[in-house]
């Protein structure tokens, strides 16, 4: 498996690493970003930072050369979700996501909203089962399937609706590649280099394990953002992935 990522012509990196920016303070976030190279990773902006700092924050990251995964997990009626996804495309992000549990009509509407953007459209990914959830959490919601089985059901629906791939745990990646094919992109949080604390992610893997499992894009947060030397940490991760490829 190569490290070449399939994305739009805007992409400046072939690294599968996506760094999760989880900061409460804008200046701290920018201080971190200015230490790293857009050739070594992409950046993920989630609900907290987008709510705090808005679209302009995303534009500033893009001006520094970074591809952005806008991780807002849209989940609404089809028309609203479609407009939200189109707004993300207008912002020029590299990837955007929705909740697969929003259903087929919602996901189809979101996909159709990106058609006018052509090759400049962001990758559209669906969230299956959050990596923090265990079987007991699903049971509380009335879902009797295991996290893996439920994620596979939602992934199948996602592919049927024509989306580019899913967010899933690394443990599901091997089977998903077998079932859904190589072109169906797998985006995986809960990736932590050897020796890192597991944090609040229940189902985790190292970057090397994730690559071997078939993960296309791996989200890494605190092991990079809290590193004394984040630029070197990223280079070490990428070098390790190149050796493992």
From Swiss-Prot:
Pathway: Pyrimidine metabolism; UMP biosynthesis via de novo pathway; UMP from orotate: step 2/2. Its EC number is 4.1.1.23. It holds the Pfam family OMPdecase. The active site is at 73 (proton donor). Belongs to the OMP decarboxylase family. Type 1 subfamily. SMART domains: OMPdecase. One of its GO terms (molecular function) is orotidine-5'-phosphate decarboxylase activity. GO terms for cellular component: cytosol. SUPFAM superfamilies: Ribulose-phoshate binding barrel. This is Orotidine 5'-phosphate decarboxylase. Keywords: Decarboxylase, Lyase, Pyrimidine biosynthesis. Gene3D superfamilies: Aldolase class I. GO terms for biological process: 'de novo' pyrimidine nucleobase biosynthetic process; 'de novo' UMP biosynthetic process. It catalyses: orotidine 5'-phosphate + H(+) = UMP + CO2. Substrate binds at residues 22, 44, 71-80, 131, 192, 201, 221-222. Homodimer.
